[in-house]
């Protein structure tokens, strides 16, 4: 996929998503990752989102259940007994009042319910691994985004630029400790 193809797919998903309207839009941040690193890797984007919120950054944490690993953001938050079924206005209120709100992807991207079963059946990574972190329904313009393979850093960076991101930090961690890059 090229950055132009990713941009088109992101815009299509964003246009059909249920929006979260946050008053503090200007400095809203999302910490999200593509997943797809395998079963031995842990979810760090959710912890990073809480650290950012503790530092008084407004966080619209967009995430889902795992498709290929041990824990997606939703799996982690569900294990902590948090309500994943918040409506858009409730998520916005959480962001505005406590600094963080969780946007459970399957509740805000209704069309994706047709894709998830196929994603779980395949061992291959798909374009949907890349689209998830780019389709935040609160339209966060600042993002910390992890990718499963370093080859996606430039196309995802170009896609974020195409989408009007104000600031972005792209991360890649290899499953092998000898091949870690930023």
Protein language model features and the residues they cover:
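Acidic, glycine/proline-rich low-complexity segments that act as flexible tails and inter-domain linkers
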Residues: 1-39
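General beta-strand structural signal in soluble alpha/beta enzymes
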Residues: 30, 59-63, 84-88, 102-104, ...
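Short glycine/serine/threonine-rich phosphate/pyrophosphate-binding segments
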Residues: 37-49, 69-71, 112, 138, ...
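A glycine-rich phosphate/pyrophosphate-binding beta-strand-loop-alpha-helix module
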Residues: 42-98
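Phosphate/diphosphate-binding glycine-rich loops and adjacent basic-rich segments that engage nucleotide
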Residues: 90-147
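Gly/Ser/Thr-rich active-site loops/lids in small-molecule metabolic enzymes
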Residues: 145-159
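Single conserved hydrophobic/aromatic residue that forms the stacking wall/gate
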Residues: 172-182
